[in-house]
Regions:
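Short, basic/aromatic recognition patches
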Residues: 2-28
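Short beta-strand segments
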Residues: 24-58, 64-66, 72-76, 84-85
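Secondary-structure transition/turn motif
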Residues: 57-59, 126-127
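A generic secondary-structure signal marking the coil-to-beta-strand transition
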Residues: 17, 25, 50, 81, ...
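Generic marker of residues within folded, mature protein domains
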Residues: 19, 35, 64, 77-79, ...
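Charged, gly/pro-rich active-site loop segments
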Residues: 1-12, 79-127
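A generic local structural motif
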Residues: 13-16, 40-41, 59, 109
Length: 127
């Protein structure tokens, strides 16, 4: 068995995290209903350098749970090098920020504006 790598310095961990946020496309979003039922879903995201933006159907458990709680826990990366993001959630409807919506569509390859179902964008601000 290969010897595990030594721990990275704080500056190296920060650099690696920022690189993953810039380079990855998908993350796992965890939420819970008001009665504590856990819900986990993969979603594509856009990283603008300080916030993550995801889009999900307005009627989905994810949207309901995150909008009720106002907080999120998300994970991205490989199991042995996972990045956990905890943050606050702010919703904005389609059409509210066209520049960000275009950036989300460009970086994720997914544009909810073209779909029939009603979607909401959720901006995650890491804490």
């Amino acid at each position: 068995m290969e010897e595990p790598a030594p721990p990275r310095s704080r500056s190296q961990r920060t650099a690696d995290t920022l690189e993953r946020l810039r380079g990855d496309v998908d993350l796992w979003v965890a939420s819970a209903s008001a009665d504590g039922e856990a819900y986990l879903v993969p979603l594509s995201y856009h990283w603008d350098g300080s916030t993550l933006t995801i889009a999900t159907p307005t009627a989905s458990p994810t949207a309901r749970n995150l909008l009720r709680a106002g907080r999120v826990r998300a994970a991205l990366g490989q199991t042995r090098d996972v990045v956990i993001v905890e943050g606050t959630v702010e919703a904005f409807p389609i059409g509210a920020d066209l520049e960000l919506e275009d950036a989300h569509a460009s970086s994720t390859g997914f544009d909810p504006r073209t779909l029939r179902d009603e979607y909401v964008y959720l901006r995650i601000t890491p804490q």
